[in-house]
C-alpha cells in the first residue's frame, strides 16, 4: 500500500541528493519515477533539481495552477514512485493532490523540503505535508557554528542576520545558513 512521505531538513541537509539517489535506485531496477520540483526555485533554471555537490537532473516544474493528480493520471505508464523537491513551496491544493495520488492511484510519493522558513514559521507546503503525510522523517545536519543539530535556517544579508522580510527569497549558501536554536538567536557570524 502506497504512502505519502515527508522528509524535511534545513539547508545543506542533503535533501536533493537523497532524491537523486532514490531515483537512481528505482531506475537501476527498471522502475520509472517522476521527479517534480516547485517552479519557484529558479537557482539552476526552472524544472531542474540540483544538489550542492553538482548533480543535476531535469524535473517537471510545479506551477501554482499545476494539476498534479491529472498529470500523473495522464502519464502513458504508471510510475513506481513520485519524488518532489522543494516541497515547502507547494500550495495546499498540490499537497492534497499528492495525497490523492497515493490513495487513488496507489503510487508512493516522497516529498522533500524545508519545514520552517528564516522567521521560524512553517511554509504552506510544509504545513499541509505535516498534516497529511503518512510518515514524517527529519533529515539531519549540523549547525554551521557548533556541533549541535541544525533545526533552523538563518537568512543573512552581507554577513548580517535577517529576521524580517518576504518569506520566499531564492538563495543558496551565500544567503541561508543551517543553525541550531542557540545560534539562530545569537549567530556567530564573524567567527
Curated annotation (Swiss-Prot):
<dbReference type="GO" id="GO:0046104">
    <property type="term" value="P:thymidine metabolic process"/>
</dbReference>
<keyword id="KW-0963">Cytoplasm</keyword>
<feature type="binding site">
    <location>
        <begin position="85"/>
        <end position="88"/>
    </location>
    <ligand>
        <name>ATP</name>
    </ligand>
</feature>
<feature type="binding site">
    <location>
        <position position="143"/>
    </location>
    <ligand>
        <name>Zn(2+)</name>
    </ligand>
</feature>
<protein>
    <recommendedName>
        <fullName>Thymidine kinase</fullName>
        <ecNumber>2.7.1.21</ecNumber>
    </recommendedName>
</protein>
<keyword id="KW-0862">Zinc</keyword>
<dbReference type="Pfam" id="PF00265">
    <property type="entry name" value="TK"/>
</dbReference>
<dbReference type="GO" id="GO:0005829">
    <property type="term" value="C:cytosol"/>
</dbReference>
<feature type="binding site">
    <location>
        <position position="183"/>
    </location>
    <ligand>
        <name>Zn(2+)</name>
    </ligand>
</feature>
<feature type="binding site">
    <location>
        <begin position="9"/>
        <end position="16"/>
    </location>
    <ligand>
        <name>ATP</name>
    </ligand>
</feature>
<dbReference type="InterPro" id="IPR001267">
    <property type="entry name" value="Thymidine_kinase"/>
</dbReference>
<keyword id="KW-0067">ATP-binding</keyword>
<feature type="binding site">
    <location>
        <position position="146"/>
    </location>
    <ligand>
        <name>Zn(2+)</name>
    </ligand>
</feature>
<comment type="similarity">
    <text>Belongs to the thymidine kinase family.</text>
</comment>
<dbReference type="InterPro" id="IPR020633">
    <property type="entry name" value="Thymidine_kinase_CS"/>
</dbReference>
<keyword id="KW-0547">Nucleotide-binding</keyword>
<dbReference type="GO" id="GO:0008270">
    <property type="term" value="F:zinc ion binding"/>
</dbReference>
<keyword id="KW-0418">Kinase</keyword>
<keyword id="KW-0479">Metal-binding</keyword>
<comment type="subunit">
    <text>Homotetramer.</text>
</comment>
<dbReference type="GO" id="GO:0005524">
    <property type="term" value="F:ATP binding"/>
</dbReference>
<keyword id="KW-0237">DNA synthesis</keyword>
<feature type="binding site">
    <location>
        <position position="180"/>
    </location>
    <ligand>
        <name>Zn(2+)</name>
    </ligand>
</feature>
<feature type="active site" description="Proton acceptor">
    <location>
        <position position="86"/>
    </location>
</feature>
<dbReference type="GO" id="GO:0004797">
    <property type="term" value="F:thymidine kinase activity"/>
</dbReference>
<keyword id="KW-0808">Transferase</keyword>
<dbReference type="GO" id="GO:0071897">
    <property type="term" value="P:DNA biosynthetic process"/>
</dbReference>
<dbReference type="InterPro" id="IPR027417">
    <property type="entry name" value="P-loop_NTPase"/>
</dbReference>
Amino acid at each position: 500500500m502506497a504512502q505519502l512521505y515527508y522528509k524535511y531538513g534545513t539547508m545543506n541537509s542533503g535533501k536533493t541528493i537523497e532524491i537523486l539517489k532514490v531515483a537512481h535506485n528505482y531506475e537501476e531496477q527498471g522502475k520509472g519515477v517522476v521527479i517534480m520540483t516547485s517552479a519557484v526555485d529558479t537557482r539552476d533554471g526552472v524544472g531542474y533539481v540540483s544538489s550542492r555537490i553538482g548533480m543535476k537532473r531535469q524535473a517537471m516544474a510545479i506551477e501554482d495552477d499545476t494539476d498534479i493528480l491529472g498529470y500523473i493520471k495522464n502519464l502513458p505508464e504508471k510510475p513506481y514512485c513520485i519524488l518532489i523537491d522543494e516541497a515547502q513551496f507547494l500550495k495546499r491544493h498540490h499537497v492534497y493532490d499528492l495525497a490523492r495520488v497515493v490513495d487513488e492511484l496507489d503510487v508512493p510519493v516522497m516529498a522533500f523540503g524545508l519545514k520552517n522558513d528564516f522567521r521560524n514559521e512553517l511554509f504552506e507546503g510544509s504545513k499541509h505535508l505535516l498534516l497529511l503525510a503518512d510518515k514524517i522523517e527529519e533529515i539531519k545536519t549540523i549547525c554551521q557554528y557548533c556541533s549541535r543539530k541544525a533545526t533552523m535556517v538563518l537568512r543573512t544579508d552581507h554577513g548580517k542576520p535577517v529576521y524580517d522580510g518576504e518569506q520566499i527569497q531564492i538563495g543558496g549558501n551565500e544567503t541561508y545558513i543551517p543553525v541550531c536554536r542557540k545560534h539562530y538567536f545569537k549567530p556567530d557570524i564573524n567567527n
